């Protein structure tokens, strides 16, 4: 039998040196997980999850907007005495997802565990948890970035974006959300092992990179969290609100670097010759899962 082998480098000991305390390191920040539809999957079941949604009456299969939009003509529903109305049928849409398994591995020898002055295994376990949390956040971000309901600031494609986020763009998104009966979020998931919700004031939540904070603060009518009074932030990373939006920032919601219009005289940040495009994830109640 061939035994598996591996090599690894242990952290160097601080022999012959004054041993200071173990300093804190930057911890990942999860923000997208406070919303969305999250379900626990029972053990020993299929890897494929199939959700079903019945379309509202009259909804068209053109795109995700029309699939969830009612089309009802009152005149077509007038009844005639003695005549049974024509029966309608429900039209389902199945949304499927395949489960994926994620993990990470650190290695430590018994010598390190027995002789090192600090608890290396405990630090490894801590970093495993933090790393998996960031993986989970990146999976969510990838799913949301793949959405097809997209609005562009100062352009019609990502490659033509040449303006910062504006209130006009936010209002366009708001109109579409409301036209599709998207409910404002009134509860966010609590940060605990049990899936529960905490009530919040109704609003559409906006998630974006921390680089976007200056643009958000420049919006007309922006209210900083320090001015909320009795109103509670939805998350420690919430920076404020404007009209029916509440803004949450995170350093992990990375931009599409060097992918917009030519920087030119736009004054926008770029890591190359083109504008860096920052996604703003705007969502209503149960908009994703």
State each model region's role.
Residues 57, 103, 112, 134, ...:
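Short loop/turn segments at secondary-structure transitions that flank enzyme active sites
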Residues 112-192:
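Alpha-helical scaffold segments that mediate packing/assembly in large oligomeric complexes
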Residues 49-51, 101-108, 126-127:
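Oligomerization/assembly interface segments of phage tail-like spikes and tubes
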Residues 1-97:
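N-terminal "assembly arms/tails" that initiate or stabilize quaternary assembly
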Residues 27-66, 164-223:
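Short, low-complexity, charged/polar segments at coil/turn and helix-coil boundaries
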Residues 88-116:
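Short acidic, glycine/tyrosine-flanked loop/strand segments centered on an H-E-D-like triad
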Residues 2-32, 160-185, 211-289:
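Sequence/fold signature of self-assembling virion shell proteins
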């Amino acid at each position: 039998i061939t035994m598996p082998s591996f090599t690894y480098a242990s952290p160097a000991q601080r022999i012959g040196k004054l041993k200071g305390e173990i300093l804190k390191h930057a911890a990942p920040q999860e923000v997208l997980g406070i919303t969305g539809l999250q379900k626990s999957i029972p053990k020993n079941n299929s890897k494929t999850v199939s959700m079903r949604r019945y379309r509202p009456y009259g909804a068209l299969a053109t795109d995700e907007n029309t699939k969830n939009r009612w089309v009802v003509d009152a005149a077509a529903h007038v009844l005639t005495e003695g005549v049974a109305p024509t029966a309608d049928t429900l039209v389902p849409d199945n949304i499927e997802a395949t489960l994926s398994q994620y993990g990470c591995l650190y290695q430590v020898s018994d010598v390190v565990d027995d002789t090192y002055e600090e608890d290396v295994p405990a630090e490894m376990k801590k970093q495993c948890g933090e790393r998996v949390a960031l993986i989970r956040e990146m999976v969510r971000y990838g799913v949301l970035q793949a959405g097809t309901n997209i609005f562009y600031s100062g352009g019609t494609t990502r490659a033509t974006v040449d303006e910062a986020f504006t209130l006009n763009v936010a209002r366009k998104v708001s109109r579409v959300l409301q036209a599709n009966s998207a409910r404002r979020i009134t509860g966010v998931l609590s940060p605990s092992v049990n899936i529960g919700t905490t009530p919040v004031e109704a609003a559409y939540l906006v998630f974006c990179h921390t680089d976007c904070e200056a643009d958000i603060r420049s919006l007309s009518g922006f209210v900083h969290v320090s001015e909320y009074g009795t109103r509670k932030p939805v998350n420690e990373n919430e920076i404020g609100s404007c009209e029916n939006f509440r803004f949450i920032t995170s350093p992990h919601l990375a931009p599409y670097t060097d992918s917009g219009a030519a920087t030119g005289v736009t004054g926008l940040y770029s890591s190359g010759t083109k504008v860096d495009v920052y996604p703003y994830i705007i969502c209503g109640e149960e908009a994703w899962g």
